């Protein structure tokens, strides 16, 4: 007679969850940040709002973003004039767009990840899909299963409207699935199309202007599994420990609400301060068991909600400027892609580490941290261990 504990032990993997492949994708429409204010105020028929345009120009100039990729083109916006108005009912128009585009962009990233992984897609046992927009039934997880031709009995998990911290959430969930289901191979897809946040400029909705200056569209996909098959699967990062916490006294710091006008965001000015004030506690909890207290000795992947957050974290922890190099590079080249950002940074870091001839996927270092920040204010923490190149 086999005991329950024996059954449980047989179900568990031996080693830690490991990233086995990464793929990314963006819409073809590339927007230069330097000229975006002119385009934005012209397409929304707001060129007469000169003071507001100057304010928006300053936001874009300070964003540290060079370019972004956006699903919304001039043609799409002209075909849907209601979405360019200030708080006009436009949710139906947005929904029709994003319920198609979120799975489509996600498929593009997933195909790249599966190709790098090099295994048949029939070996995918679990699917985690995350997006901030396009709530629908059946959801984007169902649509992706169909688009990719995955087995109909793949175990699906759909996460809607979590916001910018969710890049950490999907890794936490993938880790638990991979480590507690022997042989599991988890396809993780974060597909973010921020069109639903687009609207015309208004003096009374300055929060919305921040989003117009920062948000970009992109999708990232990972294959996660424990106990990589030697000579066949190539590990990139190990996920060693995860945590999620709500920062104290942070209610209302970042809120998002789905309205007839689309998804509206509300931000407190002190969001960078709240993040930096709580970051040390999260690091101590994560790295004290490893005997690490010098946070310049680890590699960094932080959600780039904006340059002010990165600046204050650097200042609070006395981090060397190069610690946030990969994070700032992704912010500069893609903008804030919500949950997909940290996965893009993982990809950027492993590629740059190889190009620079470093010894590990984590900039030559062994240990690292991944942070997601978002509504709540919620902080996701993932301790990563790099792999020798």
From Swiss-Prot:
Inducers of expression: By infection.
GO BP annotation list: flavonoid biosynthetic process; polyketide biosynthetic process
Domain of life where this protein originates: Eukaryota
EC class of the enzyme, as a word: transferase
Gene3D superfamilies registered for this protein in UniProt: 3.40.47.10
Reaction catalysis annotation: (E)-4-coumaroyl-CoA + 3 malonyl-CoA + 3 H(+) = 2',4,4',6'-tetrahydroxychalcone + 3 CO2 + 4 CoA
Keywords: Acyltransferase, Flavonoid biosynthesis, Transferase
Active-site residues per Swiss-Prot or TrEMBL entry: 164
GO molecular function, one term: naringenin-chalcone synthase activity
Family stated for the protein in its record: Belongs to the thiolase-like superfamily. Chalcone/stilbene synthases family.
Cited function: The primary product of this enzyme is 4,2',4',6'-tetrahydroxychalcone (also termed naringenin-chalcone or chalcone) which can under specific conditions spontaneously isomerize into naringenin.
Name of this chain's protein: Chalcone synthase 4-2
Organism: Medicago sativa (Alfalfa)
């Amino acid at each position: 007679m086999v005991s329950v504990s024996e059954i449980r032990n047989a179900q568990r993997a031996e080693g830690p969850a490991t990233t086995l492949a990464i793929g990314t994708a963006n819409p073809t429409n590339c927007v230069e940040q330097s000229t975006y204010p002119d385009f934005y105020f012209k397409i929304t028929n707001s060129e007469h709002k000169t003071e507001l345009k100057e304010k928006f120009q300053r936001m874009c100039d300070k964003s540290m973003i060079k370019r972004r990729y956006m699903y919304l083109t001039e043609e799409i916006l002209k075909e849907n004039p209601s979405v360019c108005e200030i708080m006009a009912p436009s949710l139906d128009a947005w929904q029709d767009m994003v319920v198609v585009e979120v799975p489509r962009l996600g498929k593009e990233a997933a195909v790249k990840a599966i190709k790098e992984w090099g295994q048949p897609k029939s070996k995918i046992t679990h699917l985690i899909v995350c997006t901030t927009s396009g709530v629908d039934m059946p959801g984007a997880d169902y649509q992706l299963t169909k688009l990719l031709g995955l087995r109909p009995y793949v175990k699906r998990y759909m996460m809607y409207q979590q916001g910018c911290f969710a890049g950490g959430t999907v890794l936490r969930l993938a880790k638990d699935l991979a480590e507690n289901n022997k042989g599991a191979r988890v396809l993780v897809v974060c597909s973010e199309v921020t069109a639903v946040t687009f609207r015309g400029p208004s003096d009374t909705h300055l929060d919305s202007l921040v989003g117009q200056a920062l948000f970009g569209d992109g999708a990232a996909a990972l294959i996660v599994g424990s106990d990589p098959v030697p000579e066949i699967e190539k590990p990139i990062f190990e996920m060693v420990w995860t945590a999620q916490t709500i920062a104290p006294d942070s209610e209302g710091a970042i809120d998002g609400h789905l309205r007839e006008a689309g998804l509206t965001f509300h931000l407190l000015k002190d969001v960078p301060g709240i993040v930096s004030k709580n970051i040390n506690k999260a690091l101590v909890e994560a790295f004290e068991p490893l005997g690490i207290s010098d946070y310049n000795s680890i590699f960094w992947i932080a959600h780039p909600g904006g340059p002010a957050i990165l600046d204050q974290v650097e200042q609070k922890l006395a981090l060397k400027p190069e610690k946030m190099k990969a994070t700032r590079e992704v912010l500069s080249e893609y903008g804030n892609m919500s949950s997909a950002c940290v996965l893009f940074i993982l990809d950027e870091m492993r590629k740059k580490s190889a190009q620079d001839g470093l010894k590990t996927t984590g900039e030559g270092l062994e240990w690292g941290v991944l942070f997601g920040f978002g509504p709540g204010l919620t902080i996701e923490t993932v301790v990563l261990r790099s792999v020798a190149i």
